[in-house]
Each structure stands twice: as C-alpha cells, then as structure tokens.
A protein has these predicted regions:
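Charged catalytic carboxylate motif
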Residues: 19-20, 76, 80, 142-146, ...
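Short secondary-structure junctions
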Residues: 24-32, 87-91, 280
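Active-site acidic catalytic loop and adjacent metal/ATP-binding pocket
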Residues: 36-50, 58-59, 95, 150, ...
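All-alpha amphipathic helical-bundle segments outside canonical DNA-binding/catalytic cores
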Residues: 162-165, 282-294
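Active-site activation/catalytic loop segments of kinase-like enzymes and analogous catalytic loops
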Residues: 243-281, 294-312
Length: 339
C-alpha cells in the first residue's frame, strides 16, 4: 500500500520477506537481498542477508502482530549495541540502520553487521567433533576478560538511563515466577528456604552496569580462540555486574544438572573468576550469593518452560532434563548460601 502498511494484517509472528527487504534497504541506504532465516534469539525474527556490495548483514525484526515491548523491543537492542561500541575490548555487532515501522502490524527492525564464527557452549552441547580444547579454554578466558572490560564502564557513562534492577528485585522476580509453578514437596521446601536466605543476606550493591542477561560462550561468535562478537542481546538490562559473572560460571559448572557434556574441555568456574579478577584488578565480593541467585533464577526459568511444555503437550527429552534439574538447582543454590 502507498503508506507502507501491508494490504492485509500479518499473521502473528510471520514477517513478509519483501517488506523486510524493502525496509532493511531503506535503513542501510543501499540494496539488501538474499534474505534467509537465521537461527538466533528467541524473541525476534532473525535473518541473514547480503548488500549489493556482497557484504553479509543480519536483520532483526520484532514479531509482527505483537507490541514490540520488553525482549521483543528490537530498537532497544539496537540502542544498547550502539552504546556498547564505545567500550574498548567489548566486541558487539555494529548497528547499520534501523526502521521503526508502524507496530504492531509493521514491526520495527534493525540491520547489523554479520559476525563470522561458531557459537559453541562446551558443557551444554553434544558434538561428535569438538573444537580444539586449547581454543575453547581461551574463549572462556576471553569471555571473562571481555566481561571485566564491560564492567569498567557504568551504564550511565554510556548514556543508558534505564533504572537498575536491584538484587532484591531479581529475587522477587524469580520468586513470583516460581509461585506460578507446581513443585514437588521437597523442591517447594528448598525454594522457600532458598528465597528466605537470599532475602536475608542481600549484598551491598555495586555500580550498575549493562548486563547481557545470558553471558556465555553459546552467545558469542568465535573463530579459533577469538570472540568476534557477543550476540543475542534481547534480555539486556542494567543491574549488578556480578549477575553476568555468576551466570558465566554457572554455564561452565560441570555439576550443572542439565549439562549434556560435563567433561567437555572448558575453563572451570574458579578459573573464570581468576581471569575476571585479574582483568578487573580487584576481588569480587559476595559472589557466592550471586552464584546462588543464578541457580534460583535458572530453576525458575526451567520450571516455567516445563509448565508451558506440559500445557502444550510438548514434553521432550530436553524438557524432562529441565524438570529433573529444578530441584537440583535449588539444592545447589542452598549449598552456596550455607557455605
């Protein structure tokens, strides 16, 4: 139609490829073609494409038919990526252009640079042929150093004015999520005790930093030992920097209950901490509390996923692993709160 709106309302979550190409072309100021779906992210539609100069790019589009809010707010992601280009030694894709659309029917989108490489999460991926162990371990060290570099700059210094989420608010968020899920009696008891201990021992906050929300090797494009770009910023926020560090350590923990390759070569959690502290130049206080919080958080996120899978009659082997992991994560959180 002349005003750029689709002639018919789109199906929810289904984008019109010709519309995406047209608006991506307008956003970057040169023709974009060869649009193809690209795995990555869970909250938006992601495509690979090529400019007329043969340069590969990525187009992220909010789901059509839904308000572009929270983790569907792709323009918010673009603003964060643009701000983070000012942080030395933090590799993120470059934003090449945006289009605000007319949501919800014409969804917002942005175009960013394409980062070559692989996203490999050592202890949560089953591969017949793994990358060389030395390369994977160096990727872990690079991820810890890059996280320390990110934390050298406060969110306010980057021009990000969003309100910081406090550790207490994090506890309350995941407590509310768990309250909607049916837990076995032992798990329910562990949840109650864990929540009480987390609330009773709230740590003194640090300067708010930009948080990725899922900082791990599986969200990084790597070539050899080098991290080319940290991707999938849908759930970024501003909060206590120890959250992302604790999450990185959790994903490297060989005792993680849903780890499918616990013996895969990777930096151990304490090695990641040592690299981070060396890079930041100071010890990390009260990290045990955050180690407990991220396990409580993942127990809540897993319980929600299990609940929804059961409701949709889509229980898979992966879902069963998560169901089994919920009480184990809560028990592991309690262990870290009682040391």
């Amino acid at each position: 139609m002349p005003d750029g709106r689709p002639a018919v309302r789109p199906r929810i979550g289904i984008a019109d490829p010709s519309d995406v190409v047209r608006r991506a072309t307008r956003a970057v100021g040169r023709p974009v073609r060869d649009l193809a779906p690209l795995p990555g992210g869970n909250s938006s539609l992601t495509y690979a494409a090529t400019t007329d100069a043969g340069v590969r790019v990525v187009v992220k589009v909010a789901p059509p038919g839904l308000p572009p809010v929270r983790n569907r707010d792709v323009l918010r992601q673009a603003r964060a990526l643009t701000a983070l280009t000012a942080v030395a030694d933090v590799a993120v894709p470059k934003v090449l252009g945006t289009d605000s659309g007319e949501p919800p029917d014409v969804p917002p989108l942005f175009v960013m640079s394409f980062a070559e490489g692989e996203s490999y999460e050592p202890r949560h991926t089953e591969l017949t042929r793994r990358p060389p162990a030395a390369e994977v371990r160096e990727r872990g060290a690079a991820a810890a150093r890059m996280l320390a570099a990110l934390h050298t700059v406060g969110a306010a210094e980057l021009g990000i004015a969003e309100e910081a989420v406090s550790p207490q608010a994090e506890v309350e968020r995941w407590c509310a999520a768990l309250a909607t899920c049916e837990l076995e009696p032992a798990a329910a008891q562990a949840e109650s005790e864990c929540r009480s201990r987390l609330t009773a021992a709230l740590p003194a906050p640090l300067r708010p930093a930009v948080l990725h929300g899922d900082w791990r090797l599986g969200n990084m494009q790597c070539v050899g030992a080098q991290i080319r770009a940290v991707i999938d910023w849908e759930i970024w926020s501003v909060g206590d920097p120890r959250l992302d560090l604790a999450w990185l350590r959790l994903m490297s923990d060989p005792e993680h209950p849903t780890a499918v390759a616990p013996d895969a070569p990777a930096l151990e959690p304490d090695e990641l901490l040592a690299v981070y502290e060396t890079a930041s130049g100071e010890p990390v206080a009260d990290l045990g509390w955050f180690d407990a919080l991220v396990r409580y958080k993942q127990a809540a996120a897993s319980a929600l996923l299990v609940k929804n899978a059961v409701r949709r009659d889509q229980v898979t082997e992966r879902v069963e692993r998560m169901r089994h992991g919920v009480p184990l994560l809560l028990a592991a959180a309690l262990t870290r709160l009682t040391r």
